[in-house]
Amino acid sequence: MTALAEILGCYFPYLILKEGKTHWLWLPAIISLAVFVWLLTLHPAASGRIYAAYGGIYIFTALMWLRFIDQVTLTRWDIWGGTVVLLGAALIILQPQGLLK
C-alpha cells in the first residue's frame, strides 16, 4: 500500500510533465504522497530500518508496475535484481529485533 501511494504520487506528475495531461492530476499526486508519508509513520520501529525494508518492497512494486502498467517484459536482470532486494528486505524484516516483533 505504501509503495503504491508513492508510485502514484510520482506517476501523476510524470503524466502532467511528460504526457501533457491535465494539471488537475496534481491533486491526487499530493494526496498520494501525503498518504505515503503518513503510512511510513505508522510503524514503531526505527525510521532507518523501516526505510531500508520498504526499499525492497518499493522495488518489487515498481517492477510489477513496469510489467503490468507500462507493459514492459521484465528481463532476467530485473527478476534477479528484484529477488536479491526482496531477500535483503526479508532479512531486515524477519531479524529478531526487526520490524515484526
UniProtKB/Swiss-Prot annotation:
UniProt topology in membrane: Multi-pass membrane protein
Entry GO CC: plasma membrane
Transmembrane stretches, start-end: 24-44, 50-70, 79-99
Sorted UniProt keywords: Cell inner membrane, Cell membrane, Membrane, Transmembrane, Transmembrane helix
Subcellular location: Cell inner membrane
Domain of life: Bacteria
Pfam families, sorted: UPF0060
Family: Belongs to the UPF0060 family.
NCBIfam families in the cross-refs: PRK02237.1 (NF002586)
Name of the molecule in the record: UPF0060 membrane protein ACIAD1364
Naturally occurring in which organism (per UniProt): Acinetobacter baylyi (strain ATCC 33305 / BD413 / ADP1)
Lineage summary: Bacteria, Pseudomonadati, Pseudomonadota, Gammaproteobacteria, Moraxellales
